């Protein structure tokens, strides 16, 4: 079967299309292994849907399923448009709900599913944290210096609150830098779309930024976020790195 290796702002994915849904947890662990497989943060499988352009199955590299992945959804839209010959304007179903996207060559913009479960700020380990769900749960702490990012603290917070963990530095009211520890990967990743979305929304909610800003994750790639009627849109580059055949048996 043919698969495609994708990169989107620092996150990488293995993507292929199939005719039916089924459990691919073990396959995800094999394909995403960076030493014995292809290597990726996640596996995306595109399957048909009778109402929308397609539906996806998303697996983290540890084989666990995730309802949503922001950069993964941009990669999926790029794949569907360029390789499955779908429209530039796409509606597709994820575990977090309907995602709308627009593909313009290698720039892809998506509208995240609605923001929910907004938490009151709280203190933990001498830091102020706040959480929300932008498709998957995130916890955010705003810092003066991103070198304060503490991988051991992230592991502790992730386990305690069962959420992705983000450290965010507001450079000015139009620019944020973000570092993210992701569930399922169980490590810091080069980027996380839903994590950046959570940082953007909580910064906006606390009057730290405007409603249209630039965010740079650890990969240092530029992503642009805007808020319209309580909906988060974000766009950035997507790259198909290569395609190849793989024996999935």
UniProtKB/Swiss-Prot annotation:
Enzymatic class: isomerase
InterPro entries: DAP_epimerase_AS, DAP_epimerase_DapF
Annotated site residue numbers, Could be important to modulate the pK values of the two catalytic cysteine residues: 138, 182
Pfam families noted in UniProt: DAP_epimerase (PF01678)
Subcellular location: Cytoplasm
Molecular functions (GO terms): diaminopimelate epimerase activity
Pathway field: Amino-acid biosynthesis; L-lysine biosynthesis via DAP pathway; DL-2,6-diaminopimelate from LL-2,6-diaminopimelate: step 1/1
Chief site of localization: cytoplasm
Reaction catalysed by this enzyme: (2S,6S)-2,6-diaminopimelate = meso-2,6-diaminopimelate
Record's keyword terms, sorted: Amino-acid biosynthesis, Cytoplasm, Isomerase, Lysine biosynthesis
Enzyme Commission identifier(s): 5.1.1.7
Amino-acid positions noted as binding substrate in the UniProt annotation, renumbered to this chain: 11, 60, 70-71, 164, 182-183, 193-194
Similarity field: Belongs to the diaminopimelate epimerase family.
Complexes and interactors: Homodimer.
Role description: Catalyzes the stereoinversion of LL-2,6-diaminopimelate (L,L-DAP) to meso-diaminopimelate (meso-DAP), a precursor of L-lysine and an essential component of the bacterial peptidoglycan.
Protein name stated in the entry: Diaminopimelate epimerase
Organism of provenance: Campylobacter lari (strain RM2100 / D67 / ATCC BAA-1060)
Gene name, Swiss-Prot/TrEMBL: dapF
């Amino acid at each position: 079967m043919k698969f495609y290796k994708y990169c989107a702002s620092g996150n990488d994915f293995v993507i292929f299309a199939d005719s039916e849904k089924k459990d691919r947890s073990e396959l995800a662990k094999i394909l995403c292994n960076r030493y014995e497989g292809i290597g990726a943060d996640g596996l995306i499988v595109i399957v048909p849907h009778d109402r929308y352009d397609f539906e996806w199955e998303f697996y983290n590299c540890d084989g666990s399923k995730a309802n949503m992945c922001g950069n993964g959804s941009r990669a999926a839209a790029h794949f569907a448009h360029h390789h499955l010959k779908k429209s530039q304007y796409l509606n597709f179903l994820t575990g977090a709900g309907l995602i709308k996207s627009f593909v313009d060559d290698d720039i892809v913009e998506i509208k995240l599913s609605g923001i929910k479960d907004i938490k009151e700020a709280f203190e933990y380990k001498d830091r102020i944290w706040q959480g929300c769900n932008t498709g998957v749960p995130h916890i955010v702490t705003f810092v003066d210096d991103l070198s304060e990012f503490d991988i051991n603290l992230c592991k502790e917070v992730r386990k305690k609150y069962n959420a992705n963990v983000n450290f965010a530095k507001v450079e000015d009211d139009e620019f944020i830098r973000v570092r993210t520890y992701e569930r399922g990967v169980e490590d810091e990743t080069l980027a996380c779309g839903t994590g950046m979305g959570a940082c953007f929304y909580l910064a906006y909610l606390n009057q730290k930024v405007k409603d249209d800003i630039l965010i740079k994750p650890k990969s240092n790639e530029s992503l642009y976020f805007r808020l319209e009627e309580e909906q988060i849109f974000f766009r950035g580059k997507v790259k198909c790195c290569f395609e190849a055949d793989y024996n999935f048996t």
